[in-house]
């Protein structure tokens, strides 16, 4: 009968324990990596800077890594259209304001994202513009305690010679959650939802 060296078994168990702890730590670290602050991507909450590219760049980075939370901290962040992506939670901290910029060229139309459906071809492109846009997205959340302010941006080419962008426009999407945030000063609809749940 072959004898087992007990000291080697103890070393193996100790190594296994260290490896297990290391993997657990890596797992916890990766959870921390799923939070992205728009300020880290160049956004400024000064109420002056156009943050459209910075916010969209942050959402894109979050989405490319499998999703997570995009933090909008305290401040007033002027922006044009924000393109929502699957598995991304847009979280507005207390006293955070996402405010529509007074430049209609900065707003995208849902028609830009969804060119298949005849419904969007009937409506004028101006009618389909929004501050927050999502087409074919899943598991999107807009949460927190902040404000999304449409800033009542008027469009002379819009319906009735005044209607500007919606605050939120979602199409062909599912698993959408909106909680805690306030939607203010829409120049058209606060939320326009088509084939989305």
Identify the residue ranges that each predicted region occupies:
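Bacterial N-terminal signal peptides that target proteins for export
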Residues: 2-16
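Short intrinsically disordered, low-complexity coil segments enriched in acidic
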Residues: 1-2, 197
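Extracellular/periplasmic carbohydrate-active domains that bind, remodel
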Residues: 19-22, 27-197
């Amino acid at each position: 009968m072959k004898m087992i060296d007990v000291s080697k078994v103890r070393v193996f168990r100790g190594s296994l324990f260290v490896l297990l702890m290391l993997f657990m730590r890596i797992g916890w670290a990766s959870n921390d990596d799923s939070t992205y602050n728009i300020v880290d991507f160049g956004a400024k909450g000064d109420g002056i800077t156009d943050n459209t590219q910075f916010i969209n760049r942050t959402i894109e980075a979050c989405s490319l890594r499998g999703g997570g939370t995009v933090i909008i901290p305290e401040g007033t962040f002027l922006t044009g259209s924000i393109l929502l992506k699957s598995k991304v939670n847009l979280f507005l901290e207390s006293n955070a304001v996402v405010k529509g910029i007074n430049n209609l060229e900065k707003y995208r139309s849902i028609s830009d994202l969804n060119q298949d459906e005849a419904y969007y071809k009937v409506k004028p492109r101006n009618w389909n513009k929004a501050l927050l846009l999502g087409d074919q997205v899943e598991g999107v959340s807009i949460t927190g305690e902040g404000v999304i302010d449409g800033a009542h941006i008027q469009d002379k080419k819009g319906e009735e010679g005044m209607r500007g962008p919606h605050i939120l426009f979602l199409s062909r999407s599912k698993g959408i959650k909106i909680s805690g945030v306030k939607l203010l000063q829409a120049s058209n609809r606060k939320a326009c939802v088509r084939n989305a749940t």
